């Protein structure tokens, strides 16, 4: 049975112990006191049990991390959120791990997850306070999309400052496609996304994402895309596992307010599915004397 038919039939699973666990976990999340009707979409999805919140899914994240060459590297991660990617980074045995999150609740959560294997600072990605040239890899996922042009450039410029020459900046963001997309349609997608997820999302085309990185002084090494299928049943099975996907469905069905938000987001995602994708880009800071325009 597909998730769509499952939800449309209105099945409700009841398990008081598991529902209590869901409630307790939700209380520990950032913005937990905000009602589901007004909370940012990614934290609404976290409340129902989603752990993989990246537009291109876990597979695209893993491909990006592989190309970023983490083993033995000094890694800084912007906005680690729930710490799902942090766990993958640590599994790659970096020389060091530093998470940077401006939300104190998220920072505390990831700090507990990382433990003695790294550090987490409560700071803004555009002004981390970390030492220049102190990172070999900077990673950021699903965060630049939520920023305006000025903030996008400020965050990327901070990553460039943190990187040693030759260091890699890896991003996983939401993109619109094709690169020649009609501007009116692009604008409508932005507006409808903002209404659905309650965040002023401003996705770019893949070409625009690459251009933005280059304008900030980086050299793009690789670009990969994957379908934007964040709320598709099959994607959730792959990203979350079968049992966790069932828990997510149960949590959605057991809370009317959460259900309305999730179904609203799902409707918007499906409406524009052919024009959206997840994009992962790895770029590097040029070595001294390297021709920035050489591709």
Question: What positions do the PLM features span?
Answer:
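A short glycine-rich, Lys/Arg-flanked "PGG" loop and its adjoining helix->strand segment in the class I
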Residues: 153-168
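Conserved Class I S-adenosyl-L-methionine
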Residues: 222-295
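Conserved alpha-helix/loop element of class I SAM-dependent methyltransferases that forms part
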Residues: 54-71
């Amino acid at each position: 049975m597909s998730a769509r038919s499952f939800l449309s039939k209105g099945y409700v699973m009841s398990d008081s112990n598991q529902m209590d666990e869901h409630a307790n976990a939700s209380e520990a999340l950032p913005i937990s006191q905000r009602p589901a009707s007004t909370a940012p979409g990614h934290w609404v999805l976290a409340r129902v049990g989603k752990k993989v919140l990246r537009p291109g899914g876990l597979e695209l994240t893993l491909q990006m991390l592989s190309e970023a060459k983490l083993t033995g590297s000094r890694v800084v991660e912007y906005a680690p959120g729930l710490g799902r990617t942090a766990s993958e980074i640590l599994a790659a045995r970096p020389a060091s791990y530093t998470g940077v999150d401006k939300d104190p609740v998220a920072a505390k959560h990831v700090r507990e997850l990382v433990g003695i294997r790294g550090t987490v600072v409560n700071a803004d990605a555009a002004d981390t306070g970390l030492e220049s040239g102190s990172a070999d890899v900077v990673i950021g996922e699903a965060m630049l999309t939520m920023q305006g042009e000025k903030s996008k450039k400020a965050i990327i410029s901070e990553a460039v400052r943190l990187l040693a020459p030759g260091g890699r900046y890896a991003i996983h963001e939401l993109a619109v496609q094709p690169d020649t997309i009609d501007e009116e349609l692009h604008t409508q997608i932005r507006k409808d996304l903002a209404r659905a997820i309650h965040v002023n999302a401003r996705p770019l085309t893949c070409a625009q994402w690459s251009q933005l990185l280059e304008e900030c002084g980086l050299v793009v090494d690789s670009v990969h895309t994957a379908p934007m299928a964040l709320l598709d049943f099959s994607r959730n099975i792959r990203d979350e596992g079968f049992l966790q996907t069932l828990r997510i469905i149960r949590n959605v069905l057991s809370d009317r307010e959460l259900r309305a938000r999730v179904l609203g987001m799902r409707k918007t995602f499906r409406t524009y599915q052919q024009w959206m994708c997840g994009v992962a880009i790895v770029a590097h800071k040029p070595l001294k004397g390297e021709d920035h325009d050489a591709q």
